[in-house]
């Protein structure tokens, strides 16, 4: 390790005084002008991680659904998954080190993780369309090269495409070709094969309006659309030509405001979807004949996908264990429908994609989606081999179902939640089942719910268990919540500390919006009283 060169280069990417950042679920995120030193240092860290794992590591420059003036960075581990927790700590430590401590921190990490510094390193880099992203990704490259790492800069990519590239490179091409054409071809081939088998390929299935959040999704969907155009025609809105990234558009805006994005005219019963800024989340929506807006979120996407997979397995005659993974935020109606109607087991984990992904890996087939529209399906290697064999060996009807499943497996991006891949999966399933967007929406009716935030002096006074559904501290809070829940039909409520600010998040659902609102307010008051609320007491009325 050439410590002199590192010190010299590090001075060119100096850390602003007093800036402290934390590597969270989404990596580092803050205002773009504060990130130059972090990018350089993540280039260094990616090289160490690559040497330690003897694998290609990814670095993605993006801040997803944050405003355009923000940026961020996250590292991608060898199988396309998120960075290992112990390395998240190293990332935080390295990003916050003062200039004079940089050498010591790098040596510490190398020793702690038994990194062989003679080992070759290879890093792949991708970035989104933010004005600051190109310069910041150059800082990552500086970090990689000063530590003697090799790199490939993919330039503009969606976040899930970078996860895919890393996965392909570390599986010797078995998962796919690690090029953008390889990605387009793999997904499109599977999609076109599937839609060929749809009996109802009328025009209403073939067109879709897509809000691209003025982000990278527009660029990549435009490059890709001619590959799958015989199965689907997409109309792109908020394509970045004039609007601002994530401003009044994108999956996050649509979900939180419960209304369509700016700049998209919707006729009644037209199928529409929105990506987020880096195209790893997707939500669907439509207007009914009365002009009412209907959102189809991650819960309903997971339900459509897992129901379809279950039906195919039954048809093939395979009894594989399939599981759906949700968080406490999943609507109670979706959980009931999956367990009682579809007889698919549902598991709950803590909030955060890495927890869901990890749990989903425990099943032959694991489907996970957060309500915000981030998710995918994972298939064990044994299942993939079994399905391939079935697609070649079984007789007609069973073979057709096995072939469908084989194509669906290829259509999923198993490295990460991917808006483009998920969109094609959903479109294929709707066409194959002959479902309209309203029929999909009508699988079950969401229970009315309300989410609130309560300001507290210190969010750490709240600790939870049972996948964040029960409060352990402060004493008496869970008992108070239990008593309040008993007052309303079909109700539940939970509280959890925010991961980023001193607030406590409250979720409540019940059989009517009025009851859900009352319950959420009463739980907020209990939090305010028992968990050190500050400022004004929570007021009723929304």
Curated annotation (Swiss-Prot):
Sequence positions that bind substrate: 370-372, 496-500, 505
- What are the protein's GO molecular function terms? magnesium ion binding; phosphoacetylglucosamine mutase activity
Instruction: List the CDD domains.
Output: PGM3 (cd03086)
Which Enzyme Commission number(s) are on file for it? 5.4.2.3
This protein's cofactor list reads:
Mg(2+)
Q: What are the binding positions for Mg(2+) in this chain?
A: 64, 276, 278, 280
Where, per the database record, does this protein carry N-acetylmethionine? 1
Impact noted for substituting residue 64 to A: Loss of activity
**Phosphothreonine, modified sites:** 62
Q: Which GO terms describe its biological process?
A: carbohydrate metabolic process; glucosamine metabolic process; hemopoiesis; protein N-linked glycosylation; protein O-linked glycosylation; spermatogenesis; UDP-N-acetylglucosamine biosynthetic process
Q: Which UniProt keywords apply?
A: Acetylation, Carbohydrate metabolism, Disease variant, Isomerase, Magnesium, Metal-binding, Phosphoprotein
Tell me the pathway: Nucleotide-sugar biosynthesis; UDP-N-acetyl-alpha-D-glucosamine biosynthesis; N-acetyl-alpha-D-glucosamine 1-phosphate from alpha-D-glucosamine 6-phosphate (route I): step 2/2
Catalysed reaction equations from the record:
N-acetyl-alpha-D-glucosamine 1-phosphate = N-acetyl-D-glucosamine 6-phosphate
Question: So where does this one cross the membrane?
Answer: none
Q: How is the cofactor bound?
A: Binds 1 Mg(2+) ion per subunit.
Q: Give the superkingdom in one word.
A: Eukaryota
Q: Write out the similarity annotation.
A: Belongs to the phosphohexose mutase family.
Q: Indicate the disease this protein is implicated in.
A: Immunodeficiency 23: A primary immunodeficiency syndrome characterized by recurrent respiratory and skin infections beginning in early childhood, severe atopy, increased serum IgE, and developmental delay or cognitive impairment of varying severity.
Please give the PANTHER family that the UniProt record associates with this protein: PHOSPHOACETYLGLUCOSAMINE MUTASE
Name of the protein: Phosphoacetylglucosamine mutase
Show the taxonomic lineage. Answer: Eukaryota, Metazoa, Chordata, Craniata, Vertebrata
- Gene encoding this chain? PGM3
């Amino acid at each position: 390790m050439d410590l002199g060169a590192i010190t010299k280069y590090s001075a060119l990417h100096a850390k602003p005084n007093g800036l402290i950042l934390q590597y969270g679920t989404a990596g580092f995120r803050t205002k773009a002008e504060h990130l130059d030193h972090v990018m350089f240092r993540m280039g260094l860290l990616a090289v160490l991680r690559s040497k330690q794992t003897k694998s290609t590591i990814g670095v993605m420059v993006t801040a997803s659904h944050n405003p355009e003036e923000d940026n961020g960075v996250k590292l991608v581990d060898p199988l396309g998954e998120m960075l290992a927790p112990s390395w998240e700590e190293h990332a935080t430590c390295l990003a916050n080190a003062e200039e004079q401590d940089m050498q010591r921190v790098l040596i510490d990490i190398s020793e702690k993780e038994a990194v062989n510094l003679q080992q070759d390193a290879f890093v792949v880099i991708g970035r989104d369309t933010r004005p600051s992203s190109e310069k910041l990704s150059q800082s990552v490259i500086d970090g990689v090269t000063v530590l003697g790492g090799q790199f490939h800069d993919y330039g503009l990519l969606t976040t899930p495409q970078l996860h895919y590239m890393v996965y392909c490179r570390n599986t010797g091409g078995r998962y796919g070709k690690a090029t953008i054409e390889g990605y387009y071809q793999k997904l499109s081939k599977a999609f076109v094969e599937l839609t060929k088998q749809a009996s109802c390929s009328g025009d209403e299935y073939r067109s879709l309006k897509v809000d691209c959040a003025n982000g990278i999704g527009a660029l990549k969907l435009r490059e890709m659309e001619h590959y799958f155009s015989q199965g689907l025609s997409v109309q792109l809105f908020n394509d970045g030509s004039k609007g601002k990234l994530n401003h009044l558009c994108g999956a996050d805006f649509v979900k939180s405001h419960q209304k369509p994005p700016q700049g998209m005219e919707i006729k009644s019963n037209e199928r529409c979807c929105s990506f987020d800024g880096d195209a790893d989340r997707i939500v669907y929506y439509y207007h009914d004949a009365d002009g009412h807006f209907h959102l189809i979120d991650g819960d309903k996407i997971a339900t459509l996908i897992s129901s379809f997979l279950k039906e195919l397995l039954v048809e093939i005659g395979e009894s594989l264990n399939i599981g759906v993974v949700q968080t406490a935020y999943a609507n109670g109606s979706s959980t009931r429908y999956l367990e009682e109607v579809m007889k698919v087991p549902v598991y709950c984990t803590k909030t955060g994609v890495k927890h869901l992904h990890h749990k989903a890996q425990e099943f032959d087939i694991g489907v996970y989606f957060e309500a915000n529209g981030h998710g995918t399906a994972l298939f064990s290697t044994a299942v993939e081999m079994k399905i391939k064999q079935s697609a070649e060996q079984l007789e007609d009807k069973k073979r057709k179902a096995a072939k469908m499943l084989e194509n669906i497996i290829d259509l999923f991006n198993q490295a990460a939640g991917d808006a483009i891949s998920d969109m094609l999966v959903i479109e294929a399933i709707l066409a194959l089942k002959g479902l309209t967007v309203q029929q999909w929406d009508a699988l079950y009716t969401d229970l009315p719910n309300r989410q609130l935030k309560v300001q507290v002096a210190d969010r750490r006074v709240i600790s939870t268990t049972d996948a964040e559904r029960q409060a352990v501290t402060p004493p008496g809070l869970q008992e108070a919540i239990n008593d309040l829940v008993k007052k309303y039909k079909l109700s539940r409520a939970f509280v959890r500390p925010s991961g980023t600010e001193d607030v406590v998040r409250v979720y409540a659902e019940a059989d009517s919006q009025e009851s859900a609102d009352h319950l959420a307010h009463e739980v907020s008051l209990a939090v305010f009283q028992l968990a050190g609320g500050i400022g004004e007491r929570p007021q009723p009325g929304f």
